[in-house]
Protein backbone atom coordinates (compact mmCIF):
# COMPACT_ATOMS: atom_id res chain seq x y z
CA UNK A 1 0.00 0.00 0.00
CA UNK A 2 1.37 3.41 -0.91
CA UNK A 3 0.35 5.06 2.39
CA UNK A 4 2.52 2.56 4.27
CA UNK A 5 5.54 2.88 1.96
CA UNK A 6 8.71 3.64 3.98
CA UNK A 7 11.41 3.00 1.37
CA UNK A 8 12.38 6.49 0.24
CA UNK A 9 15.96 5.66 1.24
CA UNK A 10 15.80 2.96 -1.46
CA UNK A 11 13.62 3.55 -4.54
CA UNK A 12 10.89 6.12 -3.90
CA UNK A 13 7.32 6.57 -5.13
CA UNK A 14 5.24 9.50 -6.25
CA UNK A 15 1.63 9.70 -7.52
CA UNK A 16 1.22 8.39 -11.07
CA UNK A 17 4.78 7.04 -11.18
CA UNK A 18 3.71 3.86 -12.96
CA UNK A 19 1.70 5.74 -15.58
CA UNK A 20 4.44 8.31 -16.15
CA UNK A 21 7.13 5.66 -16.52
CA UNK A 22 4.96 3.62 -18.86
CA UNK A 23 4.32 6.66 -21.05
CA UNK A 24 7.99 7.65 -21.14
CA UNK A 25 9.13 4.20 -22.19
CA UNK A 26 6.36 3.88 -24.78
CA UNK A 27 7.32 7.23 -26.29
CA UNK A 28 10.95 6.13 -26.44
CA UNK A 29 9.94 2.89 -28.15
CA UNK A 30 7.88 4.80 -30.70
CA UNK A 31 10.80 7.12 -31.47
CA UNK A 32 13.48 4.42 -31.53
CA UNK A 33 11.42 2.12 -33.72
CA UNK A 34 10.42 4.75 -36.26
CA UNK A 35 11.98 4.34 -39.75
CA UNK A 36 13.64 7.77 -39.87
CA UNK A 37 16.74 9.54 -38.53
CA UNK A 38 15.19 11.31 -35.54
CA UNK A 39 16.10 8.82 -32.83
CA UNK A 40 19.30 10.38 -31.53
CA UNK A 41 17.87 13.88 -31.50
CA UNK A 42 14.98 12.64 -29.36
CA UNK A 43 17.10 10.59 -26.95
CA UNK A 44 19.87 13.15 -26.48
CA UNK A 45 17.34 15.92 -25.91
CA UNK A 46 15.74 13.88 -23.12
CA UNK A 47 19.17 13.31 -21.60
CA UNK A 48 19.83 17.06 -21.75
CA UNK A 49 16.51 17.72 -20.00
CA UNK A 50 17.49 15.24 -17.29
CA UNK A 51 20.80 17.03 -16.76
CA UNK A 52 19.03 20.40 -16.64
CA UNK A 53 16.72 19.12 -13.90
CA UNK A 54 19.70 17.98 -11.87
CA UNK A 55 21.49 21.27 -12.41
CA UNK A 56 18.49 23.02 -10.88
CA UNK A 57 18.46 20.66 -7.90
CA UNK A 58 22.17 21.28 -7.30
CA UNK A 59 22.22 24.97 -8.25
CA UNK A 60 25.01 23.97 -10.63
CA UNK A 61 26.24 26.04 -13.54
CA UNK A 62 25.98 25.18 -17.21
CA UNK A 63 28.50 22.55 -18.28
CA UNK A 64 29.16 21.15 -14.79
CA UNK A 65 26.80 18.14 -14.56
CA UNK A 66 26.76 14.91 -16.55
CA UNK A 67 25.23 11.47 -16.33
CA UNK A 68 26.75 8.33 -14.83
CA UNK A 69 25.52 4.80 -14.37
CA UNK A 70 25.64 5.06 -10.58
CA UNK A 71 27.36 6.77 -7.67
CA UNK A 72 30.34 4.41 -7.73
CA UNK A 73 31.01 4.87 -11.44
CA UNK A 74 30.68 8.64 -11.08
CA UNK A 75 33.21 8.63 -8.24
CA UNK A 76 35.60 6.40 -10.18
CA UNK A 77 35.36 8.67 -13.21
CA UNK A 78 36.33 11.64 -11.06
CA UNK A 79 39.18 9.91 -9.24
CA UNK A 80 40.74 8.54 -12.42
CA UNK A 81 40.65 11.99 -14.03
CA UNK A 82 42.64 13.80 -11.34
CA UNK A 83 46.21 14.98 -11.91
CA UNK A 84 48.68 12.44 -10.48
CA UNK A 85 49.89 14.82 -7.76
CA UNK A 86 46.38 15.16 -6.36
CA UNK A 87 46.47 11.66 -4.87
CA UNK A 88 49.94 10.11 -5.17
CA UNK A 89 51.70 10.00 -1.81
CA UNK A 90 48.73 11.54 -0.04
CA UNK A 91 45.79 10.32 1.97
CA UNK A 92 42.17 9.93 0.91
CA UNK A 93 39.80 10.43 3.82
CA UNK A 94 36.43 8.74 4.21
CA UNK A 95 34.17 7.78 7.09
CA UNK A 96 33.42 4.19 8.08
CA UNK A 97 29.73 5.02 7.65
CA UNK A 98 30.10 5.90 3.98
CA UNK A 99 28.22 4.03 1.28
CA UNK A 100 30.20 0.74 1.27
CA UNK A 101 30.44 0.68 -2.52
CA UNK A 102 32.51 3.87 -2.43
CA UNK A 103 34.84 2.32 0.14
CA UNK A 104 35.25 -0.82 -1.96
CA UNK A 105 36.26 1.42 -4.86
CA UNK A 106 38.81 3.40 -2.85
CA UNK A 107 40.36 0.29 -1.32
CA UNK A 108 40.85 -1.16 -4.78
CA UNK A 109 42.36 2.01 -6.25
CA UNK A 110 44.75 2.92 -3.43
CA UNK A 111 47.77 0.89 -4.54
CA UNK A 112 47.42 1.69 -8.24
CA UNK A 113 47.07 5.43 -7.68
CA UNK A 114 49.57 5.63 -4.84
CA UNK A 115 47.41 7.00 -2.05
CA UNK A 116 46.74 5.80 1.48
CA UNK A 117 43.12 5.22 2.36
CA UNK A 118 42.29 6.61 5.80
CA UNK A 119 38.92 5.42 7.09
CA UNK A 120 37.68 7.31 10.14
CA UNK A 121 36.27 4.64 12.47
CA UNK A 122 33.06 4.54 14.44
CA UNK A 123 33.35 4.97 18.17
CA UNK A 124 32.64 1.90 20.27
CA UNK A 125 28.94 1.10 19.94
CA UNK A 126 28.23 4.11 17.71
CA UNK A 127 26.08 4.02 14.57
CA UNK A 128 27.83 6.85 12.72
CA UNK A 129 31.14 8.70 12.57
CA UNK A 130 31.15 11.81 14.74
CA UNK A 131 31.94 15.03 12.90
CA UNK A 132 34.67 15.91 15.38
CA UNK A 133 36.43 12.60 14.74
CA UNK A 134 36.36 13.17 10.99
CA UNK A 135 37.70 16.71 11.42
CA UNK A 136 40.48 15.51 13.73
CA UNK A 137 41.62 13.04 11.07
CA UNK A 138 41.56 15.71 8.36
CA UNK A 139 45.12 17.00 8.23
CA UNK A 140 47.15 18.68 5.46
CA UNK A 141 48.25 15.22 4.30
CA UNK A 142 44.72 14.59 3.00
CA UNK A 143 44.63 15.11 -0.75
CA UNK A 144 40.94 14.32 -1.10
CA UNK A 145 38.05 13.80 1.31
CA UNK A 146 34.75 12.19 0.41
CA UNK A 147 31.97 13.49 2.62
CA UNK A 148 28.83 11.44 3.11
CA UNK A 149 26.17 14.12 3.55
CA UNK A 150 23.66 11.68 5.06
CA UNK A 151 24.50 8.13 6.09
CA UNK A 152 22.49 5.27 4.60
CA UNK A 153 22.71 3.25 7.81
CA UNK A 154 21.87 5.88 10.45
CA UNK A 155 20.51 8.95 8.59
CA UNK A 156 23.13 11.03 10.40
CA UNK A 157 23.72 14.31 8.56
CA UNK A 158 27.09 15.99 8.80
CA UNK A 159 27.69 19.68 9.45
CA UNK A 160 28.58 20.34 5.83
CA UNK A 161 29.56 23.97 6.31
CA UNK A 162 32.04 23.12 9.06
CA UNK A 163 33.46 20.19 7.11
CA UNK A 164 34.04 22.16 3.93
CA UNK A 165 35.52 25.14 5.78
CA UNK A 166 38.00 22.85 7.52
CA UNK A 167 38.83 21.05 4.28
CA UNK A 168 39.60 24.33 2.56
CA UNK A 169 42.03 25.23 5.34
CA UNK A 170 43.75 21.87 4.77
CA UNK A 171 44.06 22.42 1.02
CA UNK A 172 42.19 19.22 0.15
CA UNK A 173 39.89 18.39 -2.71
CA UNK A 174 36.38 17.94 -1.32
CA UNK A 175 33.66 15.71 -2.71
CA UNK A 176 30.21 15.00 -1.38
CA UNK A 177 27.96 11.97 -1.78
CA UNK A 178 24.50 13.51 -1.48
CA UNK A 179 22.54 10.38 -2.42
CA UNK A 180 20.59 9.85 0.80
CA UNK A 181 19.00 13.30 0.99
CA UNK A 182 19.05 14.72 -2.55
CA UNK A 183 15.61 15.99 -3.45
CA UNK A 184 14.40 16.16 0.14
CA UNK A 185 16.81 18.50 1.91
CA UNK A 186 18.00 21.51 -0.13
CA UNK A 187 21.56 21.17 -1.40
CA UNK A 188 23.71 23.72 -3.21
CA UNK A 189 27.08 22.77 -4.72
CA UNK A 190 28.18 26.40 -4.37
CA UNK A 191 27.22 26.98 -0.72
CA UNK A 192 29.46 25.64 0.62
CA UNK A 193 31.43 25.15 -2.58
CA UNK A 194 32.61 21.58 -3.12
CA UNK A 195 34.90 20.28 -5.85
CA UNK A 196 32.58 17.49 -6.89
CA UNK A 197 29.31 15.83 -5.93
CA UNK A 198 27.77 12.48 -6.80
CA UNK A 199 24.24 11.14 -6.55
CA UNK A 200 21.62 8.79 -7.91
CA UNK A 201 18.11 9.59 -9.11
CA UNK A 202 16.58 6.94 -6.88
CA UNK A 203 15.27 7.49 -3.34
CA UNK A 204 13.70 10.92 -2.73
CA UNK A 205 13.97 11.73 -6.43
CA UNK A 206 11.90 8.60 -7.24
CA UNK A 207 13.81 7.84 -10.45
CA UNK A 208 15.15 4.63 -11.97
CA UNK A 209 18.37 2.62 -11.66
CA UNK A 210 21.27 3.70 -13.85
CA UNK A 211 20.49 7.42 -13.64
CA UNK A 212 23.45 8.66 -11.62
CA UNK A 213 24.95 12.13 -11.86
CA UNK A 214 28.37 13.72 -11.47
CA UNK A 215 28.95 17.40 -10.70
CA UNK A 216 32.46 18.82 -11.05
CA UNK A 217 33.40 22.41 -10.23
CA UNK A 218 34.73 24.40 -13.22
CA UNK A 219 38.24 24.80 -11.79
CA UNK A 220 38.59 21.06 -11.31
CA UNK A 221 37.13 20.31 -14.74
CA UNK A 222 39.92 22.35 -16.30
CA UNK A 223 42.56 20.22 -14.54
CA UNK A 224 40.87 16.87 -15.10
CA UNK A 225 41.82 14.39 -17.80
CA UNK A 226 39.29 11.56 -17.61
CA UNK A 227 40.79 8.15 -18.29
CA UNK A 228 37.92 6.70 -20.34
CA UNK A 229 37.55 9.07 -23.25
CA UNK A 230 35.88 8.90 -26.61
CA UNK A 231 34.11 10.87 -29.27
CA UNK A 232 31.65 12.42 -26.80
CA UNK A 233 34.56 13.69 -24.68
CA UNK A 234 35.29 16.32 -27.34
CA UNK A 235 33.83 19.76 -27.88
CA UNK A 236 32.71 18.51 -31.30
CA UNK A 237 31.88 14.79 -31.16
CA UNK A 238 32.03 14.64 -34.95
CA UNK A 239 35.68 15.65 -35.06
CA UNK A 240 36.95 12.28 -36.15
CA UNK A 241 40.57 13.06 -36.93
CA UNK A 242 42.15 10.29 -34.85
CA UNK A 243 45.31 12.36 -34.35
CA UNK A 244 43.59 15.52 -33.15
CA UNK A 245 41.72 14.58 -29.97
CA UNK A 246 41.07 17.39 -27.50
CA UNK A 247 38.91 17.35 -24.38
CA UNK A 248 35.78 19.48 -24.30
CA UNK A 249 36.26 22.55 -22.09
CA UNK A 250 33.41 21.60 -19.75
CA UNK A 251 31.87 18.55 -18.07
CA UNK A 252 31.47 16.85 -21.45
CA UNK A 253 35.08 15.72 -21.13
CA UNK A 254 33.74 13.20 -18.59
CA UNK A 255 31.56 11.65 -21.29
CA UNK A 256 33.31 9.08 -23.45
CA UNK A 257 31.66 6.87 -26.05
CA UNK A 258 28.04 6.93 -27.17
CA UNK A 259 26.08 7.89 -24.05
CA UNK A 260 23.42 5.70 -22.52
CA UNK A 261 20.13 7.56 -22.43
CA UNK A 262 17.40 5.18 -21.31
CA UNK A 263 17.91 5.56 -17.54
CA UNK A 264 17.90 9.35 -17.82
CA UNK A 265 14.87 9.27 -20.10
CA UNK A 266 13.03 6.92 -17.73
CA UNK A 267 13.87 9.07 -14.69
CA UNK A 268 12.92 12.37 -16.31
CA UNK A 269 9.19 12.14 -15.45
CA UNK A 270 10.11 11.75 -11.77
CA UNK A 271 12.40 14.78 -11.95
CA UNK A 272 9.69 16.74 -13.76
CA UNK A 273 7.25 15.79 -11.01
CA UNK A 274 9.74 16.83 -8.35
CA UNK A 275 10.33 20.19 -10.04
CA UNK A 276 6.60 20.99 -9.78
CA UNK A 277 6.41 20.34 -6.04
CA UNK A 278 6.57 22.66 -3.06
CA UNK A 279 9.90 21.41 -1.75
CA UNK A 280 9.45 22.99 1.67
CA UNK A 281 6.13 21.15 1.99
CA UNK A 282 7.75 17.83 1.04
CA UNK A 283 10.31 18.27 3.80
CA UNK A 284 7.72 19.43 6.34
CA UNK A 285 5.61 16.34 5.62
CA UNK A 286 8.63 14.11 6.18
CA UNK A 287 9.49 15.91 9.41
CA UNK A 288 5.99 15.42 10.80
CA UNK A 289 6.05 11.70 10.11
CA UNK A 290 9.61 11.14 11.30
CA UNK A 291 8.82 12.98 14.54
CA UNK A 292 5.94 10.57 15.10
CA UNK A 293 8.20 7.59 14.41
CA UNK A 294 10.79 8.85 16.90
CA UNK A 295 8.12 9.31 19.57
CA UNK A 296 6.81 5.81 18.89
CA UNK A 297 10.31 4.33 19.15
CA UNK A 298 10.63 5.90 22.58
CA UNK A 299 7.23 4.50 23.59
CA UNK A 300 8.31 1.02 22.48
CA UNK A 301 11.78 1.40 24.05
CA UNK A 302 13.44 0.69 20.72
CA UNK A 303 16.89 2.31 20.53
CA UNK A 304 17.04 5.15 18.03
CA UNK A 305 20.28 5.26 16.07
CA UNK A 306 19.26 8.33 14.04
CA UNK A 307 20.11 11.69 15.64
CA UNK A 308 17.10 13.36 17.24
CA UNK A 309 17.95 16.90 16.17
CA UNK A 310 16.47 17.71 12.74
CA UNK A 311 19.62 19.57 11.71
CA UNK A 312 21.66 16.43 12.29
CA UNK A 313 19.57 13.94 10.35
CA UNK A 314 18.27 13.19 6.89
CA UNK A 315 14.79 11.94 6.10
CA UNK A 316 14.97 8.48 7.65
CA UNK A 317 14.43 7.05 11.11
CA UNK A 318 16.49 3.99 11.89
CA UNK A 319 15.86 1.75 14.87
CA UNK A 320 17.98 -0.98 16.41
CA UNK A 321 15.80 -4.02 16.97
CA UNK A 322 16.57 -6.44 19.80
CA UNK A 323 17.67 -9.97 18.98
CA UNK A 324 14.21 -11.15 20.03
CA UNK A 325 12.89 -9.32 16.96
CA UNK A 326 15.01 -10.61 14.04
CA UNK A 327 14.97 -7.74 11.58
CA UNK A 328 14.65 -9.88 8.46
CA UNK A 329 11.60 -11.59 9.92
CA UNK A 330 10.07 -8.27 10.99
CA UNK A 331 10.48 -6.87 7.46
CA UNK A 332 8.82 -9.99 6.03
CA UNK A 333 5.93 -9.82 8.49
CA UNK A 334 5.41 -6.13 7.81
CA UNK A 335 5.45 -6.83 4.08
CA UNK A 336 2.67 -9.33 4.62
CA UNK A 337 0.62 -6.51 6.12
CA UNK A 338 1.27 -4.28 3.12
CA UNK A 339 3.93 -2.21 4.90
CA UNK A 340 7.19 -1.63 2.98
CA UNK A 341 10.40 -1.33 5.02
CA UNK A 342 13.87 -2.83 4.97
CA UNK A 343 16.74 -3.60 7.31
CA UNK A 344 20.51 -3.67 7.48
CA UNK A 345 21.49 -6.21 10.10
CA UNK A 346 19.30 -5.47 13.11
CA UNK A 347 18.68 -1.89 11.97
CA UNK A 348 15.14 -1.27 10.75
CA UNK A 349 15.12 1.56 8.19
CA UNK A 350 12.02 3.75 7.89
CA UNK A 351 11.76 6.62 5.41
CA UNK A 352 8.36 8.29 4.95
CA UNK A 353 7.83 10.38 1.84
CA UNK A 354 5.15 12.00 -0.27
CA UNK A 355 2.99 8.87 -0.56
CA UNK A 356 3.29 7.94 3.12
CA UNK A 357 0.47 9.23 5.32
CA UNK A 358 0.05 9.83 9.04
CA UNK A 359 -2.56 7.08 9.07
CA UNK A 360 -0.10 4.78 7.32
CA UNK A 361 2.53 5.68 9.89
CA UNK A 362 0.13 4.76 12.69
CA UNK A 363 -0.54 1.46 10.92
CA UNK A 364 3.20 0.72 10.95
CA UNK A 365 3.51 1.68 14.61
CA UNK A 366 0.59 -0.54 15.62
CA UNK A 367 2.05 -3.44 13.64
CA UNK A 368 5.44 -3.03 15.35
CA UNK A 369 3.78 -2.88 18.76
CA UNK A 370 1.87 -6.09 18.04
CA UNK A 371 4.99 -7.87 16.79
CA UNK A 372 6.89 -6.69 19.85
CA UNK A 373 4.21 -8.06 22.19
CA UNK A 374 4.30 -11.45 20.46
CA UNK A 375 8.08 -11.79 20.74
Give each language-model segment a name.
Residues 1-375:
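Pyridoxal 5′-phosphate
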Amino acid sequence: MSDTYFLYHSIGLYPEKTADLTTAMAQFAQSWGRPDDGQWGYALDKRAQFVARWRAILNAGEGTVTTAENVTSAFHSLLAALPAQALAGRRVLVGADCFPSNHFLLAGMAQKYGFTLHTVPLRQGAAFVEDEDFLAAWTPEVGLALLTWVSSTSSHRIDLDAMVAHGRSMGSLIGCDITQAAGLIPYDVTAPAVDFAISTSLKWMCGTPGAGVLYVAPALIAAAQPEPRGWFSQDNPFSWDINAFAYAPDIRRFDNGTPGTIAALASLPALDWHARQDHAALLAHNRRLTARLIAAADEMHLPLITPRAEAKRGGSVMLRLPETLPAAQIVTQLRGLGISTDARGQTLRLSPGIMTTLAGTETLITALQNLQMRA
